[in-house]
Amino acid sequence: MRYLTSGESHGPQLTVIVEGVPANLEVKVEDINKEMFKRQGGYGRGRRMQIEKDTVEIVSGVRNGYTLGSPITMVVTNDDFTHWRKIMGRAPISDEERENMKRTITKPRPGHADLLGGMKYNHRDLRNVLERSSARETAARVAVGALCKVLLEQLDIEIYSRVVEIGGIKDKDFYDSETFKANLDRNDVRVIDDGIAQAMRDKIDEAKTDGDSIGGVVQVVVENMPVGVGSYVHYDRKLDGRIAQGVVSINAFKGVSFGEGFKAAEKPGSEIQDEILYNTELGYYRGSNHLGGLEGGMSNGMPIIVNGVMKPIPTLYKPLNSVDINTKEDFKATIERSDSCAVPAASIVCEHVVAFAIAKALLEEFQSNHIEQLKQQIIERRQLNIEF
């Protein structure tokens, strides 16, 4: 299973092609659009999300509500393109026209791809870099993840997310499954403890007033995974490695951990390893879940707990020092329309990126041409955990 996205932030559309989805999977576009809507929400978002109304159009790979087993193409229209039609159009324009529209960027933003991308691809107008490196591309990745969540639901696998920390204000590290799911999306910062939600909003408002931005930590939980997905045999087949690669590929994400993560370094092994238990109903299970559902690069049947660290967004309304690439003179960095905090939205993006990593691993573990075949193999693996 793989996918390819295309499109620029202010171009006409984002396009994604997904290959490897089994045939006969029931897909309702409204289920995908429900997930797309979640990405647009969250306290601290900028004006762009007031313009866009992200919805997906499926243009191939699905017929009469069911997947065909062929590549699935989805399109997300950029409504904001109407304001950028000439500057982002395909037809050539003169340097004078470009200058008059004041859209040329020569002052790279610290922490963004602007300068290095310009060097690498020889772009003197850094807009050519930021249009593709923008987090707008994550809308396409959420569409992919939403499709994967439809698949996972058919396998009785649940995946959900929350915000753990914003700007140093922290929620509890872990919640039991029932509390977690009962409190999803109860507030606009996506935190479980409603008592700290306002403190987070205040922190975001403070950053916005100061022309600054703040980051945070998000958490994704995957429940009811069959055991043994992934592998200890080769580095590139380890499930935690694959999830980690996906998470740190999200714009502005700078760290990932599983279960107790970096806190494991502070504790003895006797407090971190999860004891193996058995009963005839569950089969093998663990007495705790410090390791976040992963051992030896494989799922162990416990909830997979993924923590992702998002740095503050690099576009600042109180810009940092930079250098004009044409004159080499000191300037303040370019200001682009941006969010003061995108952590709540990033939790949704992270959830869908993890959903793809899980779905991809399952389809490699249980190679299946159609959904019925996949379901049967999952049932057999779950039974193995009891009978082994």
From Swiss-Prot:
Essential cofactor(s): FMNH2
Name of the protein described by the UniProt record: Chorismate synthase
Give the E.C. number(s).
Answer: 4.2.3.5
* GO process annotations (BP): amino acid biosynthetic process; aromatic amino acid family biosynthetic process; chorismate biosynthetic process
Residues engaged in binding FMN: 132-134, 251-252, 296, 311-315, 337
Subunit structure, as described in the record? Homotetramer.
HAMAP family recorded for this chain? Chorismate_synth
The record, for Pfam families, names:
Chorismate_synt (PF01264)
Biological role = This reaction introduces a second double bond into the aromatic ring system.
**NCBIfam families with a match to the protein in the record:** aroC (TIGR00033), PRK05382.1 (NF003793)
Cofactor info, note text: Reduced FMN (FMNH(2)).
What pathway is this protein a component of? Answer: Metabolic intermediate biosynthesis; chorismate biosynthesis; chorismate from D-erythrose 4-phosphate and phosphoenolpyruvate: step 7/7
Gene Ontology molecular function: any one: FMN binding
Please spell out the taxonomic lineage of the organism that makes this protein: Bacteria, Bacillati, Bacillota, Bacilli, Bacillales
Cite the binding residues for NADP(+).
Answer: 39, 45
Q: Which GO terms describe its cellular component?
A: cytosol
- Family to which the UniProt record says this protein belongs: Belongs to the chorismate synthase family.
Specify the enzyme's EC class, one word.
Answer: lyase
Catalyzed reaction equations:
5-O-(1-carboxyvinyl)-3-phosphoshikimate = chorismate + phosphate
Q: Which UniProt keywords apply?
A: Amino-acid biosynthesis, Aromatic amino acid biosynthesis, FAD, Flavoprotein, FMN, Lyase, NADP
